[in-house]
């Protein structure tokens, strides 16, 4: 399957895994803050995405919106699961497919899900400072592609 193929490509790329783990080390210092930043960047970059999150209420309220906070935290733990599974194709497929189900249920297409790469790039840049580089963005984009293949 396409999912297995892409998951295998990520798991077998030592350089990308190093970049993912190193950058995750930075992103995960403040799980909630990073999750909220990523969501805010998504809504800025892709205003149409706001409509997909109508159930969360006023997303411009940021941290004051408990539903948005909850989603941001859950999102970060999903990323943690992906990073923890980088050495095991079957495990990576399992956690990605579980994550994908939530998005399939909300009718998020693979293309729509792919819109997260730009906001993720902005978030990485803000969090990593001088350590930021495009190879790190590419590594995360490879992981996003595994999710897209599951949608």
UniProtKB/Swiss-Prot annotation:
InterPro entries in the cross-refs: Globin (IPR000971), Globin-like_OT (IPR050532), Globin-like_sf (IPR009050), Globin/Proto (IPR012292), Mb-like_M (IPR044399)
Record bears the keyword Iron: yes
Gene3D superfamilies xref list: Globins (1.10.490.10)
Keywords of the record: Acetylation, Heme, Iron, Metal-binding, Oxygen transport, Transport
N-acetylserine: residues bearing it: 1
Residues in the signal sequence: none
SUPFAM superfamilies xrefs: Globin-like
Binding site for heme b: 103
GO molecular function, one term: metal ion binding
Residue span, Globin domain: 11-151
Family from the record: Belongs to the globin family.
Subunit field text: Heterotetramer of two alpha chains and two beta chains.
Protein name per UniProt: Globin-2 B chain
Organism (species): Anadara inaequivalvis (Inequivalve ark)
């Amino acid at each position: 399957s396409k999912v297995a193929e892409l998951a295998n490509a990520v798991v077998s790329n030592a350089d990308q895994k190093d970049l993912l783990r190193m950058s995750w080390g930075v992103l995960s210092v403040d799980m909630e803050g990073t999750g909220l930043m990523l969501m805010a960047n998504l809504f800025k970059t892709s205003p149409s995405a706001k409509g997909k999150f109508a159930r969360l209420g006023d997303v411009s309220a940021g941290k004051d919106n408990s539903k948005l906070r909850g989603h941001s935290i859950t999102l970060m733990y999903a990323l943690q699961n992906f990073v923890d599974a980088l050495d095991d194709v079957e495990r990576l497929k399992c956690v990605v497919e579980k994550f994908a189900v939530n998005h399939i249920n909300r009718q998020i297409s693979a293309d729509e899900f792919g819109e997260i790469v730009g906001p993720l790039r902005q978030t990485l840049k803000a969090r990593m400072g001088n350590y930021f580089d495009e190879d790190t963005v590419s590594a995360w984009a490879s992981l996003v592609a595994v999710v897209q293949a599951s949608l």
